[in-house]
Design a protein with these regions (language model features):
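Electropositive phosphate-/nucleotide-binding environments in soluble metabolic enzymes
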Residues: 9-12, 131, 172
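Short, charge-patterned binding micro-sites
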Residues: 34
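Conserved AdoMet/S-adenosylmethionine-binding subsite of the radical SAM
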Residues: 16-28, 37-164
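A short acidic, glycine-rich active-site loop
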Residues: 4-6, 91-101, 169-173
């Protein structure tokens, strides 16, 4: 859900026609964005997708915990991937806007305790994040019992913020070092 309408959400009819056309080749659907939980009618769309027989993964930033709880309680999701933008103590820095951290924590706790598959992930943006930011997020998640934390590496392509096009991607060596260090945090 992400384009075509003024509110940024796709026309449900188009989505359903497309899925029905290709359903013999498709087993699962990822609902992504923007932020799909702000789209009106999301639950209705997911219910229809479920009736087609497809599994559903939701990508979310966690800003709408009540919507997330409703979708989970209705059995409309099979997997949730939530972006953790950075350490919660300075979350607005990583989002570019102030965010109610309680919503983020509420969504995080809902996902951890909901009984379906999940992962948390942070996109590392050089110059915005430090390595210590990632270690802080990893330690926070480990203490909550999370086992599935992924780091994504920022790529300067199709960015909403033009200045981000000038950011140099993380070197392979740095990425491997960070992945190894984060992995050690999750070792028991």
């Amino acid at each position: 859900l992400g384009i075509n309408k003024p509110d940024g959400c796709m026309e449900q009819e188009w989505v359903l026609n497309h899925l029905n056309k290709y359903k013999k080749w498709v087993e699962r659907v990822t609902i992504s964005g923007g932020e799909p939980t702000v789209c009106r009618g999301l639950g209705e769309l997911l219910g229809t997708i479920k009736k087609i027989g497809l599994s559903i993964k939701l990508d979310t930033n966690g800003s709408k915990p009540d919507t997330l709880k409703e979708l989970i309680s209705k059995g409309l999701l099979d997997f949730v991937a939530m972006d953790i933008k950075g350490p919660l103590n300075n979350y607005g820095k990583y989002c570019g806007v102030e965010v109610d951290k309680d919503y983020i924590e509420d969504s995080l706790n809902t996902i951890i305790n909901c009984g379906i598959g999940y992962e948390f992930r942070t996109t590392y943006v050089p110059g915005l994040h430090s390595e210590n930011d990632l270690y802080e997020v990893a330690e926070y998640l480990r203490k909550k019992g999370v086992k599935n934390y992924k780091i994504q590496w920022f790529q300067p392509k199709n960015t909403l913020e033009p200045s981000y096009m000038d950011i140099k991607p993380v070197s392979k060596q740095t990425a491997e070092h960070i992945k190894k260090s984060v992995g050690l945090i999750f070792k028991d």
